[in-house]
Amino acid sequence: MEVKDILKTVDHTLLATTATWPEIQTILDDAMAYETASACIPASYVKKAAEYVSGKLAICTVIGFPNGYSTTAAKVFECEDAIKNGADEIDMVINLTDVKNGDFDTVEEEIRQIKAACQDHILKVIVETCQLTKEELIELCGVVTRSGADFIKTSTGFSTAGATFEDVEVMAKYVGEGVKIKAAGGISSLEDAETFIALGASRLGTSRIIKIVKNEATKTDSY
């Protein structure tokens, strides 16, 4: 697989709590230069970033991030606000407390409400696979499918582990037709990226792939 084809799947990501505007600018410049799928950045930078790229790059942001236990109303507001400010894609975090309580209906209803707030913008649902049993992940594949979301996403990159090949294999087997897969967190090589794509991921959330291409990768990057 050619590097340029891998790059087309990448949501070039900077979600560090201390991210500065010059660092965000670098993410945006690199994402445009290497023609990635999007740049994924904190919501507080969306308006400025959207003005900066002026339609040349899709802007992705996160809501309910990274823990997911804010209220549905708060997440809906975050979504609407991000879209108003120029976000093209939304990555939301589900409420894992509902999952652990076995309340999958509430999880599904929340995703439905946020998808309605997204209108025709892309919605990716982060399920935080490192915190799930295999049975919970299988159930959530059905929940995300029924909710009308566009993607199921493995990880925030802020928990105990990121994407694994096994997680993506399970998603590819159990998610419904029309729902795509985003692998995120800890994707540390072009070889891993290619494997995730081969297993069924059509998006990769990472900050490292462009750095690898530019020979700038460091072992301290978690996302």
Curated annotation (Swiss-Prot):
Q: What does this protein do?
A: Catalyzes a reversible aldol reaction between acetaldehyde and D-glyceraldehyde 3-phosphate to generate 2-deoxy-D-ribose 5-phosphate.
Q: Which domain of life is it from?
A: Bacteria
Q: Name the gene behind this protein.
A: deoC
Tell me which InterPro entries the record gives. Answer: Aldolase_TIM, DeoC, DeoC/FbaB/LacD_aldolase, DeoC_typeI
Location(s), subcellular: Cytoplasm
What reaction is this protein's catalytic activity?
Answer: 2-deoxy-D-ribose 5-phosphate = D-glyceraldehyde 3-phosphate + acetaldehyde
The UniProt similarity line reads: Belongs to the DeoC/FbaB aldolase family. DeoC type 1 subfamily.
Gene Ontology biological-process annotations: 2-deoxyribose 1-phosphate catabolic process; carbohydrate catabolic process; deoxyribonucleotide catabolic process
Q: What is its EC number?
A: 4.1.2.4
Keyword vocabulary terms for this entry: Cytoplasm, Lyase, Schiff base
Organism taxonomic ancestry: Bacteria, Bacillati, Bacillota, Bacilli, Lactobacillales
Q: In which pathway does it act?
A: Carbohydrate degradation; 2-deoxy-D-ribose 1-phosphate degradation; D-glyceraldehyde 3-phosphate and acetaldehyde from 2-deoxy-alpha-D-ribose 1-phosphate: step 2/2
Catalytic site residues? D91 (proton donor/acceptor), K153 (schiff-base intermediate with acetaldehyde), K182 (proton donor/acceptor)
- Listed PANTHER family: DEOXYRIBOSE-PHOSPHATE ALDOLASE (PTHR10889:SF1)
One GO cellular component term: cytoplasm
> What is the scientific name of the source organism?
Streptococcus pyogenes serotype M4 (strain MGAS10750)
The protein in question is named Deoxyribose-phosphate aldolase
The UniProt GO MF terms for this protein read: deoxyribose-phosphate aldolase activity
Spell out the Pfam families in the cross-references.
Answer: DeoC (PF01791)
